[in-house]
């Protein structure tokens, strides 16, 4: 009971690192973390506004496929017939 276990030594080491060397680094990390959360929330709000804009478009509107006038699709049997 009187001796310190490895868990106690680990906690003591972390506390000493924070007190003597990591105070500024930890506050910087927390600031970066907060900026990341704010950016995430902002982007989520932007996505929701884009979804609302998409929902206002006509529900039956389907854009036509791209038409390439210089391209004709041929099957492999047609190609084989043309080569023989």
Curated annotation (Swiss-Prot):
Residues 64-77 have a biased composition (Polar residues). The keyword Transmembrane applies. The keyword Membrane applies. It comes from the Bacteria. Part of the twin-arginine translocation (Tat) system that transports large folded proteins containing a characteristic twin-arginine motif in their signal peptide across membranes. TatA could form the protein-conducting channel of the Tat system. The Tat system comprises two distinct complexes: a TatABC complex, containing multiple copies of TatA, TatB and TatC subunits, and a separate TatA complex, containing only TatA subunits. Substrates initially bind to the TatABC complex, which probably triggers association of the separate TatA complex to form the active translocon. This is Sec-independent protein translocase protein TatA. The lineage of its organism: Bacteria, Pseudomonadati, Pseudomonadota, Alphaproteobacteria, Acetobacterales.
